[in-house]
């Protein structure tokens, strides 16, 4: 409506009349809007994180180590996509003494959740990160002399002595460790050890392969190089933690435990070294709509699938925006009512289509499992990896970044 200047004197009357009109039943009241705003958001897809499975895996690992080596729980990558705020309390409950993360946000989150134990950053960090992280009482990973010298200066200016772990390249990652097989690397280690505002509390390396025979060879190399570093620097062995073992090495090569193990995937049931640990994550959605389509019809973008029979198709409101990638187009399966069912056509941004013709009875809202178990059926990590060409960890982190995580049991 266009209101001209000469009509402005009518505005008070118009307003009075409008305000006196009854509110239509078709409009939400302010009260109902407020109540609705306080309710949890209904999600199109979500990840269920099993507290019971996580607790089981943690206890099993602690029992395996039997106090022969310190357990450092690696919770980087937002606990591999499982939600750091959900996983950390389970570590606290089980009295885990060491946690390893990567980012400053993760450092802050772990401390805010009440963890007061040993906190290690398990990657190289920028100087800005490390300067801010002094507030979180973190032990930094250092494998570069120049970085060590600059961090030492920052620590001195702040009146602090920082604990660090010296990274060696003994396993051949060529990522962030000193090459102490050469004189230059040993000299760098000696220089770092002499910095007054840094204290070396650990010497570590990291394995690039999951092969027991290679790990044993790398372990022998690390032990010799660590011995050389201790000799040239004058460090006291009893004050240094030696640690190299990741999840695979911890389970497959007990000799690699040394003073501490750094395990991550095992907490979430993600390891090829053992089938005794439980999967923690399940990826779920619900059926949004059901439609019958005739034989010969096509499904999805680019008509990549042609129906071979009259079919009942279920619309699942999850797509590549939720981390269910296009690689699952015409290849993936989901589970509904305990049966594996095929994904038809290309995955859309927010939708996948599933053939439910063979189900005896199917209804709107039925639960859909995109990863994990339902009844006796299961979508396994190996299947996800084969179809996606990605590590399952890569997928779990992606799903965690794009979907609500809910703690169950």
From Swiss-Prot:
NCBIfam families: alr, PRK13340.1-4. The active site is at residues 76, 301. Belongs to the alanine racemase family. Bsr subfamily. GO terms for molecular function: alanine racemase activity; arginine racemase activity; lysine racemase activity; pyridoxal phosphate binding. Substrate binds at residues 175, 349. Disulfide bonds join 72-98. Its main location: periplasm. It is an enzyme of class 5 (isomerase). GO terms for biological process: D-alanine biosynthetic process. This is Broad specificity amino-acid racemase.
